Amino acid sequence: DNEKDNILQYNVNVGEKLSADFQKLLKPPHCLEWEKMFYPFIIFSKKRYVGNLYEHDVKKFKQKSMGIVLKRRDNANIVKIIYGGLINIILNKQDITESLKFLDESLNKLANGEYPLEELIVTKTLRGFYKNPLQIAHKVLADRMKKRDPGSAPQSNDRVPYVYIQVKETKKKKLLQGNKIEDPKYLIQNNLTPDYGHYITNQIMKPCLQLYSMVLEDLKGYKHKNDKKIWQNKYKILLEDKKDKIKVDDKIKQLREKEVEELLFSKYINKIENKKSGIKSMTDFLI
C-alpha cells in the first residue's frame, strides 16, 4: 500500500507541477489545471470505462464508471450485486481469481433461486402512448394488470415493476416479451417461478464476457494456453478475408467472448434449462 501511495503521490505532484508550469505560458482566462487520475482503470471502448478516481488526496478515491451496465436503470439490482461485486474485487483487490470465485458462487446462488425476489425486479416508466404497444413489454403487462384489477393498475408516468418469469414456449408458438414478465405481487400470490436463466443470459452475462475476454488467456480451462499466437494468427486470416480492421476487431472480440461464455456460463445456463425441462443432473442423485 505504501508503494502504491508513493506512486500515486508522484503522479499528483507531477500533474500539479505541470499545471503550474503551463500556467506561466497561458494567458488568462485559459487554465490548464490538474484534475484527476484513475487507478486501476479498465477501458472497454471509447467512453466506456470503470476505475478508482483520485484527485489531490491519494488516500481518498471513489469508483467512477461511464457507459457500462452499472449506470443503467433498466437492469435488475442483481446486476449491480454480481457484476458490481466482481468489479469491486478487481479494482480494490486486483485479484482476477477471487473475482471468478465470486462470480461462480453468485451464478450458482442465482441458478438455485437463492436471491430475494426484490433483487430481480426491473422497473420502467409507463408512457401514455406507444406506436407499437405490443412490442413494449411493460405496457403489455400494465394492460394485463388493468384487466385483472382496474383500480390498482399502473397509470401513465408510473414506474412499472416486473420480474421475468418461466413460461412454456414452443417453436411454433413464440410469446411476446410482455407475456414473459409479471407483477411481483401477482408472482408471489400465484406461486410463479422467476426465469433465473433470463437474468444470467440477458443482463449479467454480456458485461461479464466483455470484462473477462480481456484476460481470456488467464482463465482456468482455456484450451489454447500453449498456442501464444493463436489470436494473432486468427487476426491475420480474418484481415486477409475481410480487409476491414474494425470488422476484424469486432469478430475477434466475439470469438473471445464466446470462449469466455463456454468457460464461465455454459454450465449454469444448462443447469437452468435442464431444471425447466425436468432433466436431473448426476449431482441431483448424490446424497
Regions found by a protein language model. Give the residues of each.
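DNA-dependent DNA polymerase catalytic subunits
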Residues: 1-287
